[in-house]
A protein has these predicted regions:
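Active-site-proximal cofactor/substrate-binding loop regions of enzyme domains
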Residues: 38
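Short acidic beta-strand-loop surface patches of small beta-rich interaction domains
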Residues: 41-49
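Gly/Pro-biased beta-strand-loop elements
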Residues: 67-178
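Loop/turn positions that initiate beta-strands
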Residues: 23, 53-58
Length: 185
């Protein structure tokens, strides 16, 4: 969470540098600092993402350019693969922004662009895969049931924000390393 002055601030946070430990991967470090996979890999192009050497200096890109959009509610920057949430502010209180990395649609499953609203929220959701997703999984030898119940194997994770766009939602994941990649349906 960052406080900022909407009249003059377009950037929040600051870059950090840490030292990699023996068992670290860039994916592990990204999750620890609320970053996506591509964010941390792009900030450390000379570092092996799966085997950084112990003692290697790792740049933590926790400085964020705020989107050029109305700063209210949820704003998603697809190019940055990042969600920005601008909560309502009480009079006299500083404006805040909360930001999280996210995965976006694969190239063949383009993420839509435009204005929508959150139609509903659910904790521990079931997932009803679309026929095309079930067909794709069956073709790959991984058939899906008609309904995936809540739990650790549910691709929706533990929370879902259903959007007014049919079949689109902002949701958790059962595969945290996919955060910050083009891997979603």
């Amino acid at each position: 969470e960052f406080s900022f002055d909407p009249a003059r601030d377009d950037v929040v946070g600051s870059l950090q540098v840490i030292t990699a430990n023996q068992d670290d991967t860039l994916s592990d470090i990204a999750r620890r600092f609320n970053l996506g996979y591509e964010e941390i890999v792009n900030a450390n192009p000379e570092v092996d993402p799966w085997l950084p050497k112990a003692g290697t200096k790792i740049v933590i890109p926790t400085q964020f350019v705020l989107p050029d959009a109305p700063r209210q509610g949820i704003v998603i920057n697809l190019a940055a693969m990042r969600l920005f949430y601008f909560p309502k502010t009480k009079t006299g209180q500083p404006q805040k922004v909360i930001t999280h990395p996210l995965g976006i649609g694969r190239v063949e499953w383009k993420t839509p662009e435009g204005m929508t609203r959150v139609a509903s929220k659910k904790e521990n959701p079931s997932w009803i895969p679309t026929p095309s997703i079930r067909k794709e999984h069956a073709k790959n030898g991984d058939p899906l049931p008609a309904i995936v119940p809540p739990g650790p194997d549910n691709p929706m994770g533990t929370h879902v924000l259903k959007l007014d766009w049919p079949s689109y939602a902002i949701h958790g994941t059962d595969k945290p390393p996919s955060i910050g990649l083009r891997g979603s349906h």
